[in-house]
UniProtKB/Swiss-Prot annotation:
Pfam families: NADH_dehy_S2_C, Proton_antipo_M. One of its GO terms (molecular function) is NADH dehydrogenase (ubiquinone) activity. Keywords: Electron transport, Membrane, Mitochondrion, Mitochondrion inner membrane, NAD, Respiratory chain, Translocase, Transmembrane, Transmembrane helix, Transport, Ubiquinone. It catalyses: a ubiquinone + NADH + 5 H(+)(in) = a ubiquinol + NAD(+) + 4 H(+)(out). InterPro entries: Complex_I_Subunit_2 (IPR050175), NADH_DH_su2_C (IPR010933), NADH_UbQ_OxRdtase_chain2 (IPR003917), ND/Mrp_TM (IPR001750). This is NADH-ubiquinone oxidoreductase chain 2. One of its GO terms (cellular component) is mitochondrial inner membrane. It comes from Pteropus rodricensis. The chain crosses the membrane at residues 1-21, 25-45, 59-79, 111-131, 149-169, 178-198, 201-221, 237-257, 274-294, 326-346.
Length: 347
């Protein structure tokens, strides 16, 4: 893709998200969503092949349906209340439809089917944008409408997302699909705390984006897309492979890594609000995510895939790509748990 065209497209993607996050008028928010969606489709089709075409078509249809539901909710709210302001509480029916529209845009279950398929059909850089930046705009709308959201509907979306995010990743060998199912589960965790402590939702979102960005950048550096190719990287790039596995365990929420902190804070906040069954169920279902990351770590680091190579470890590395920019990301992805007492300043 021409660098000038790519710069224009990326600027439009960022501008669309910024419009959604900063607008106080529902029509402007809808325009921001449409700008973002139409600009991100060429990024998904950057590598022109049938799989990316199929993935971008699925993404377009899903996002267009969600935008239609958004306009339905806004129009219904306009009929009942006569106002377009995002800051004013929505009508209960409009709030429910809006929640479903944002759930479809985020990929929350039962609207999750597009996420693994689209992520698998596109390149790693496009997948990184899809699973990180594209979550900001819908999450900002949910953040703004969070007080009057239907709690029963929200609990159903949360439980289904965390369960599907765990079950779906169990039988996968494609790393992009594993990351997609992990994204579904993380979106469930973020939504769980939305009505109790929206600030913690933003903290969880930032840590999720940090971990996912680090993981995808290491996948790009090692050209790894499957569990088999990941198992073959340890004798070429042992340090990078170790960092990949540690970051993935952090994504699964294994203490004492960084990914454990948001789960710990969310469970603590839910129990403070006299909710015991919900965090217990979420913690048990999160073990599914941790299991497939542990299994991936075990198969990569402690077992040997069949190989014709007699000498397993190379004595000379010819790896020339710079990894300097990864150092701060890897440190933040694995070692920020000791900083958690500083979160008391947010309260």
């Amino acid at each position: 893709m021409n660098p000038l065209v790519f710069t224009m497209i990326m600027s439009t993607v960022m501008l669309g998200t910024a419009i959604v996050a900063t607008s106080s008028h529902w029509l402007m928010a809808w325009i921001g969503f449409e700008m973002n969606m139409l600009a991100v489709i060429p990024i998904l089709m950057k590598k022109y092949n049938p799989r990316s075409m199929e993935a971008s078509t699925k993404y377009f249809l899903t996002q267009a349906t969600a935008s239609m539901l958004l306009m339905l909710a806004v129009t219904m709210n306009l009929v009942y209340s006569g106002q377009w302001s995002i800051t004013k509480p929505l009508n209960p029916t409009a709030s429910t439809i809006m929640t479903l529209a944002m759930a479809m845009k985020l990929g929350l279950s039962p609207f999750h089917f597009w996420v693994p398929e689209v992520t698998q059909g596109i390149s790693l850089p496009s997948g990184l944008i899809l699973l990180t930046w594209q979550k900001l705009a819908p999450m900002s709308i949910l953040y703004q409408i969070s007080p009057p959201i239907n709690l029963d509907l929200l609990m159903m979306l949360i439980n289904l997302s965390i369960a599907i995010g765990g079950w779906g990743g169990l039988n996968q060998t494609q790393l992009r699909k594993i990351m997609a199912y992990s994204s579904i589960a993380h979106m469930g965790w973020m939504t769980a705390i939305l009505t109790y402590n929206p600030t913690m939702t933003l903290l969880n979102l930032m840590i999720y984006i940090l971990l996912t960005t680090t993981t995808f950048m290491m996948f790009m550096l090692s050209s790894t897309t499957t569990t088999l190719s990941l198992s073959h990287t340890w004798n070429k790039m042992p340090l990078l492979t170790t960092a990949i596995l540690l970051t993935m365990l952090s994504l699964g929420g294994l203490p004492p890594l960084s990914g454990f902190m948001p789960k710990w804070m969310i469970i603590q906040e839910l129990t403070k609000n006299n909710s015991v069954i919900m965090p217990t169920t979420m913690a048990v279902m999160a073990l599914l995510n941790l299991y497939f990351y542990m299994r991936l770590t075990y198969s990569t680091s402690l077992t040997m895939f069949p190989s014709t190579n007699n000498m397993k470890m190379k004595w000379q590395f010819n790896y020339t790509k710079s990894t300097t920019h990864l150092s701060p990301l890897i440190i933040l992805s694995t070692l920020i748990l000791p900083l958690s007492p500083m979160l008391a300043l947010l309260e």
